[in-house]
Amino acid sequence: MLLPCHWVLDATFSDGSLGQWVKNTCATYALSPVVLPPQPQPRKKATDKDYSAFHLGHLREVRLFLRGGTSDQRMDSLVLCPTYFKLWRTLSGSPGLQLSDLHFGSQPEGKFSLRRAVSVKQREEPQDWPLNEKRTLWKDSDLPTWRRGTGYTLSLPAVSPGKRLWGEKAGSLPESEPLFTYTLDEKVDKLVQFLLLKYQAKEPLTRAEMQMNVINTYTGYFPMIFRKAREFIEILFGISLTEVDPDHFYVFVNTLDLTCEGSLSDEQGMPQNRLLILILSVIFIKGNCASEEVIWEVLNAIGPWSALAGFADVLSRLALWESEGPEAFCEESGLRSAEGSVLDLANPQGLAGHRQEDGRRGLTEASPQQKKGGEDEDMPAAGMPPLPQSPPEIPPQGPPKISPQGPPQSPPQSPLDSCSSPLLWTRLDEESSSEEEDTATWHALPESESLPRYALDEKVAELVQFLLLKYQTKEPVTKAEMLTTVIKKYKDYFPMIFGKAHEFIELIFGIALTDMDPDNHSYFFEDTLDLTYEGSLIDDQGMPKNCLLILILSMIFIKGSCVPEEVIWEVLSAIGPIQRPAREVLEFLSKLSSIIPSAFPSWYMDALKDMEDRAQAIIDTTDDATAMASASPSVMSTNFCPE
């Protein structure tokens, strides 16, 4: 059995010479620790002939404190855990430790070799420990916890901050001798984030930027950290860094010619190829045939999930609020109610149900259900519409004027208009194009990447909460109130936050904000959906309920127009259902995902068929009414004709 010990080594260096080592040993087991008391000796230059070898056993942890030769100020500390050490003893009996390639400034301090540990019996006899012919200790059978063979040599990294590491040249570090794993991983992770921010901003980068913003004091390890980060973004995102200047000037190049949402517009945003690569890799590993359960098991490990599932989760929680009350809602969603009646939507996860708590940084991806019909377009992976990859733009005079117009309503009930269904979709596409042309004339905000995404989500959630409170109290809201109460120090991002919050409450609750005083930016609320629901029958507005209706219709529509009646009535028991055409549901989903309706081919055809059926019913009704009207005079003439 080996004796695990905790060693604290306090070293003193002076002019490149080994000084006195002071060691205190405490055993972690019940066995007596080995104590090597320091022996006083005059300082002299270290040479190999001044030392004879002895070995220490298995160490649980070694903490090495490094001090200046003429000062008691501690430079740094190095923790090694666990490993095997070879210690040296001078001819006078004073113990010393040799470290390999450990440079402070340009002064090497000797060699550090790893050897197999010794047994407890040998530990009890620290003097003249025997070595075999190969100058290694004991047999493998006597060392159950040591499996590295006859011997191993490893170099330790430099830890002194503010000094050149690993000799005179910063690039002289062998890449096979890394930092501690957690430090290396942390630096690689930070560099990956920095590279992605540069990619989103469409900016080149230099080695000096990476060293100054990420690498910091670990400049000697830059080649290793940069290589790992470069491989990571190339494998996962399909982005390659190409050096275009001998002075380490790099630009981003897409290595995969893939069609995805990010490549359909000039806005690069966060690369989305990684999800496709991941799914294709899983399919390839499984022999070109992977079940949906296997795919989702992999996707659940990294975060993306169905957009419609997230949307349904949000609205079902709101249904719980309406039917069961605030207490049941808060208990279900893990939120708290403020003052017993006000919904606390400051938690973005409770509001939108779309952000998981893993902290990495959240990229939203599409789910397999969103690929229905063989199309490549993606839908947002959250209940709330996804935040833009680049910030929206605003006109010079302030935030964009909010139109009270909501989703497109039913066409005029005439046979001609009802039959021209393709024109409806063309009109919807034209409206979308006109909106894009209008936004092209706005001025750009500071890039959203400079504001952390989680902070942006939180501000949007807080503003939605504030707007809903104002809606419940039937009070108008001003820009000054929003800036003072919610936005606070993020005033530069007000147009972006306000735009997302307004879009959210309009899509989910059917509430539009109309600017009734452009000078003071005073807004009032207006219902955009011409729907009959409980809240419109009384003077009390309360929490808007349109979202519940849209939820149920969406559920029926998504399930292929076939859902068990028990499931529907279980949800609708407290609110009262109303039928809406499939076209309006499809328009709503299209607006929510910013995709044209024809991107959902099967649902699109169903909606067209539904419209044709409705149009035919109107025609039949009109024909019947005409026939009855034409038949009426003849009947009357028969009744009143003279005998």
UniProtKB/Swiss-Prot annotation:
GO CC terms of this entry: nucleus
Keyword hit for Endoplasmic reticulum: no
PROSITE patterns: MAGE (PS50838)
Region (Disordered): 347-421
Tissue/organ expression: Expressed in testis. Not expressed in other normal tissues, but is expressed in tumors of different histological origins.
Record-linked InterPro entries: MAGE, MAGE_WH1, MAGE_WH2, MHD_dom
Biased composition, class Basic and acidic residues, residue ranges: 354-363
Composition bias type Pro residues, residue spans: 383-414
Gene3D superfamilies: MAGE homology domain, winged helix WH1 motif, MAGE homology domain, winged helix WH2 motif
Gene Ontology process terms (BP): negative regulation of transcription by RNA polymerase II
Keywords linked to the UniProt accession: Phosphoprotein, Repeat, Tumor antigen
Key word Phosphoprotein present: yes
Protein's recorded name: Melanoma-associated antigen C3
Gene: MAGEC3
